Swiss-Prot record:
Cytoplasmic topological segments: 1-84, 135-155, 206-219, 313-888
Subunit structure of this chain's protein: The potassium channel is probably composed of a homo- or heterotetrameric complex of pore-forming subunits.
Protein's recorded name: Potassium channel AKT6
Domain notes: The segment S4 is probably the voltage-sensor and is characterized by a series of positively charged amino acids. The pore-forming region H5 is enclosed by the transmembrane segments S5 and S6 in the Shaker-type (1P/6TM) and contains the GYGD signature motif which seems to be involved in potassium selectivity.
Record has Oxidoreductase as a keyword: no
ANK repeats: 543-572, 576-605, 609-638, 640-669, 673-702
């Protein structure tokens, strides 16, 4: 049997279906529903007020996944809902016609009889349709689509009543005797259909598209009119069947009432019925005979209960609207009484009343957004807060430079509050529990001096106050009082610290912003706070997590020493991959550099751009720092020398180029694209640097990867001074000045190999490390090194900024082997002429120690073949012949 989808969200079934109850069709149905919801952007009215909620658990059997058999209709199908709504209007007609026919008609009379049969026809169709409508099991809340169970349920409940109320009286009346007037009684059976109206109002009361107040009022009005209509029809029926028409209530106004038109009689009966129901007018129905008196007795008792029900409902509706006002007035009265009873100052009493009035206003106008936000899921709360307040918080000086992640979290945790004019937000000397951001309005910053309040300044939109007390953990410095209606964002100190604990780098930025703000302030109070705060930082008494980079950026060697003693890693990095040694070297903080080196900081560690601390000191023109770093093993790696040379040229810093040479670098080397420092100097037009580079042996005909030579660039740019300099320059054969530790090999005429990689941090390039040849692996700085996985892997790998094991022979370019330096040592005292070949050690002390072992005496100095004394190991090249001697 073919199946079709059952919809719970008002989606039409455009397909004919097919297949069984397999998961494929179920999945298609789910996908179609999801597409429907995505297109509309919101769920239809059937999703919440009329649909089903799935049961808990991932493996529940939800009715949303049911695929109904063919010809079975879902009770949630919008077409079936429309059919039910249409029948409700027919029921309203039946509610009027049935009592009227019972009281005023003795037999069928057109056009009512025709309309009755038409209406009966629609309800007959509904009886047949009900046999094909699935129903919900009240126990399992699953949709039952078995035709047999549907038929049995309907047949055992409402079928007999629906059939009887739909059966035409013309067929039924022909079976009765003429003396039996059953037309009116039979018409009253149709009132069974009123249950549909009750169900319809129950659905409307839950539908958010309709006002609950007006739905309830409409329902009560219809109930009242129906009761009055039934009362008039029933009482008229009693009068019409009474033997003596003159002894009825109708005869009180017109003795010949039976001769009046039926409309007049109906109007008279309705008048007496409504005056009795509402107990208004000049009197109630006056029962003349015993039948009328008996009916009126029950009618009045019923009216008493119905009136109580209506009055109770209307009272609840009205009280719900006015309850807030009553509660507000009671609260205001209680607050005023409290202030007067305790002799509070008038200013405090006014603040109490103003705050309560503002809270009532925000409640009544729907502005109390915090209560609404707190009732929503976290994701929705975060999105709302981000939309409303992110732009304001992003401009606060305290959060300049922090990550977007922390800023988003801070915005989510902030609470929006309204404050009326002249209300104290913060009191001077109170505990620092919160700080505030001003969204709208204005506040006065007030200081109490010698018992007198003085306005220090005024804060406008986008300002923050209370942050000094919160971040420095000291009593609030000022009283903050609103000038006009203001909206504030409040952030709790505990929440802030918890967020900063997970973002240590951002915490340092926040503290730095605060200290800079205090430093820029001209207020003497702020200057005192700055001094106290710096002292607390040096003593390590701040709750905020501080990093070495923060201390190095401030040049605070006391704080740096305190953090190092607490176990902070001397090589920890900030978000840019810079270590505290990078920062201290760039700022020339001598004591900070000494502390870091003493605690094991790596002098050759690189940041994310490939810069080393030695280069930071060189480019910052801190010669003492550069010398200190060099003495502690800092070097310029071969793969970065060309990059540093290019930076020095761009900054037009000739001294930096000289320092590069001083610390073993070759400023004539090309980068990975074949570009040399001379190329850049010509492009920038730095004549003095061009002269210096030519003196260092730079090749003015060296082409880069695009074929441009320095000479060609000078001709292209038309720089006459440089062109003249090139023309007058006499090319001399320059013996390459190697970086110490790099062996020399004969030039084969093959040009320097060019690489497509970046000019810095090349993989597989050679660096200097105590005169030995090592391999410098390319490092990619990212968040991995700070993660748990990075920490674990760093213990098992030397690639994470640690030393790389040395190898006696390292593969060079083109598959050749590059061997370490070798020298020949000899001693005139032993009479040797040939000498002995040894590996060049890392220091002069080691060389003298080797000589002692080889020569059998204790040498004290190293000489060249010509007799010149050598006092630095870096002056010795591969293949040199050395003489060892001792002082006489």
């Amino acid at each position: 049997m073919e199946k079709k989808k059952v919809w719970f969200w008002g989606v039409k079934d455009d397909g004919e279906g097919g297949g069984g109850r397999g998961g494929g069709r179920t999945k298609d149905a789910e996908d179609d529903v999801a597409d429907h919801l995505s297109r509309d952007g919101t769920m239809s009215q059937y999703s919440l007020s009329k649909g089903l909620l799935p049961s808990l658990g991932a493996n529940n059997r939800s009715s949303r996944d049911v695929i109904l058999p063919r010809f079975i209709v879902s009770p949630f199908d919008p077409r079936y809902r429309a059919w039910e709504t249409f029948l409700v209007f027919l029921v309203l007609y039946t509610a009027w016609a049935s009592p009227f026919e019972f009281g005023f008609l003795q037999k069928p009379r057109p056009p009512l009889s025709i309309l009755d049969n038409i209406v009966n026809g629609f309800f007959a169709v509904d009886i047949v349709l009900t046999f094909f409508v699935a129903f919900l099991d009240k126990v399992t809340y699953l949709l039952v689509d078995d035709p047999k169970r549907i038929a049995w349920r309907y047949a055992s409940t409402w079928l007999i009543f629906d059939v009887v109320s739909t059966f035409p009286y013309e067929i039924f009346g022909s079976l009765l005797h003429e003396s039996i007037q059953g037309y009116g009684i039979f018409s009253m059976l149709r009132l069974w259909r009123l249950r549909r109206v009750s169900n319809c109002f129950a659905r409307l009361e839950k539908d958010r598209k309709y006002s609950y107040f007006w739905v309830r009022c409409s329902k009560l009005l219809l109930v009242t009119l129906f009761v009055i209509h039934c009362g008039a029809c029933f009482l008229y029926s009693i009068a019409a069947h009474y033997p003596d028409p003159s002894k009825t209530f109708m005869a009180l106004t017109d003795e010949n009432w039976k001769e009046s038109p039926i409309a007049v009689r109906y109007n008279t009966a309705m008048y007496w019925s409504i005056t009795t129901f509402s107990t208004t007018g000049y009197g109630d129905i006056h029962g003349v005979n015993s039948r009328e008196m008996t009916f009126i007795l029950f009618y009045m008792v019923f009216n008493l209960g119905l009136s109580a029900y209506i009055i109770g409902n209307m009272t609840n509706l009205v009280v719900h609207v006015t309850g807030r006002t009553r509660k507000f007035r009671d609260t205001i009265q209680a607050a005023s009484g409290f202030g007067q009873r305790n002799n509070l100052p008038v200013r405090l009493q006014d603040q109490m009343v103003a705050h309560l009035c503002l809270r009532y206003r925000t409640d009544s106008e729907g502005l109390q957004q915090q209560e609404i936000i707190d009732s929503l899921p976290k994701a929705i709360r975060s999105s709302i807060s981000h939309y409303l307040f992110y732009e304001v918080v992003d401009k606060i000086y305290l959060f300049h430079g922090i990550s977007n992640d922390l800023l988003f979290q801070l915005v989510t945790e902030m609470k929006a509050e309204y404050f009326p004019p002249k209300e104290d937000v913060i009191l001077q000397n109170e505990a620092p529990t919160d700080f505030y951001i001003l969204v709208t309005g204005a506040v006065d910053i007030i200081a109490r001096v010698n018992g007198v309040e003085q306005v220090v300044s005024e804060a406008q939109r986008g300002h923050v106050f209370g942050e000094v007390g919160v971040l420095c953990y000291r009593p609030q410095l000022f009283t903050v009082r609103t000038k006009r209606l203001s909206q504030l964002l409040r952030l709790n100190r505990t929440v802030l610290l918890n967020l900063v604990q997970a973002n240590v780098g951002d915490g340092a930025i926040i503290m730095n912003n605060l200290l800079q703000h205090l430093k820029d302030s001209e207020d003497p109070v702020m200057k005192g706070v700055l001094a106290d705060t710096e002292h607390m930082l040096a003593q390590g008494k701040m709750d905020l997590p501080l990093s070495l980079c923060f201390a190095a950026a401030r040049g605070d060697d006391l704080l740096l020493h305190q953090l190092l003693r607490r176990g902070s890693s001397p090589n920890e990095m900030d978000k840019d991959g810079r270590t505290a040694l990078h920062i201290a070297a760039s700022k020339g903080s001598h004591y900070c550099v000494v502390l870091l080196l003493e605690h094991g900081a790596d002098p050759n560690i690189r940041d994310s751009e490939g810069n080393v601390p030695l280069w930071e000191a060189i480019i910052g023109r801190h010669r003492e720092i550069a010398k200190l770093l060099a003495e502690n093993g800092a070097k310029l790696s071969l793969d970065s020398v060309s990059y540093f040379s290019g930076l020095a040229v761009e900054k037009n810093c000739l001294d930096a180029l000289k320092d590069i040479i001083k610390y073993g670098g070759d400023v004539t080397l090309p980068d990975g694209n074949g570009t040399t420092a001379l190329h850049r100097a010509v492009s920038e037009g730095h004549l003095e640097i061009v002269k210096f580079l030519l003196d260092q042996g730079a090749d003015l005909d060296w082409p880069d990867s695009y074929g441009w030579t320095p000479r060609g660039l000078a001709d292209h740019q038309g720089n006459e001074e440089i062109k003249t300099l090139f023309h007058n320059h006499r090319p001399v054969e320059k013996k390459p000045k190697p970086i110490p530790g790099i062996p020399q090999s004969p030039v084969t005429g093959k040009p320097l190999m060019k690489y497509s990689s970046e000019p810095t941090m090349h993989s597989g390039e050679l660096v200097l490390d105590g005169g030995q040849v090592v391999v410098s692996q390319k490092r990619k700085l990212n968040n991995f090194r700070n993660s748990l996985f990075g920490i674990i892997s760093a213990a098992n790998s030397a690639d994470d900024g640690g030393e790389v094991p040395r190898s006696p022979a390292v593969p060079g370019g083109g598959g050749s082997m590059i061997y370490p330096e070798r020298v020949t040592i000899s001693s005139p005292e032993n009479g040797e002429t040939g000498g002995k070949v040894v590996l060049l050690p890392n220091s002069m002390e080691e060389l003298l120690k080797i000589g002692e072992n080889k020569m059998g005496f204790v040498p004290t100095k190293v000489l060249t073949r010509e007799g010149a004394e050598i006092d630095d190991i870096t002056l010795i090249r591969d293949g040199d012949f050395l003489l060892l001697s001792r002082d006489p």
